[in-house]
Design a protein with these regions (language model features):
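Short helix/turn-capping signatures at newly exposed starts of structured segments
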Residues: 1-103, 114, 118-134
Length: 134
């Protein structure tokens, strides 16, 4: 099973946790404390041999975007920019068009869009998945 469904934008983590457009229940609702809007940083969830930390933006009780940060891969903290970027692109099942230059990538998808960027100073690589209103 793929981590990211490219048609719907649903994220399915190895540990069974799921995030999808419009979702505002379970762990998200509990973390928001009943609020209709806000930003929620969830704990790490496994994905393909690593741990990703999702930060979710909720508006009008629906999931609007998810930012994925890498916590570790194979029980080792991820420090090198190229390794982080390679891991994240592999999880998202997307070809990195600029693996040597670390240029930010914008991808338009049926569910919305993805922005994948690497900070050249810290090496931190993140993916922001933005869902289009249905």
């Amino acid at each position: 099973m793929a981590f990211l469904n490219m048609e719907t934008g649903e994220l399915t983590f190895t540990d069974g946790f799921r995030l999808s457009a419009g979702l505002a229940m379970g762990e998200l609702a509990d973390a928001l404390g009943g609020a209709m809007d806000g930003v929620v940083r969830l704990g790490g969830h496994t994905a393909g041999g690593g741990v990703l930390i999702p930060v979710c933006a909720v508006q009008g009780s629906a999931l609007q975007s998810v930012t994925l940060s890498i916590s570790s891969v194979g029980n080792r903290p991820m420090r090198k920019a190229e390794r982080q970027r390679e891991f994240l692109f592999a999880r998202l099942n997307v070809q990195d068009p600029f693996p040597d230059t670390l240029i930010p990538v914008h991808i338009t998808c049926p569910f919305g869009e993805m922005h994948i960027s690497t900070d050249p100073y810290t090496g931190r690589t993140e993916a922001r998945i933005i869902y289009t209103a249905q």
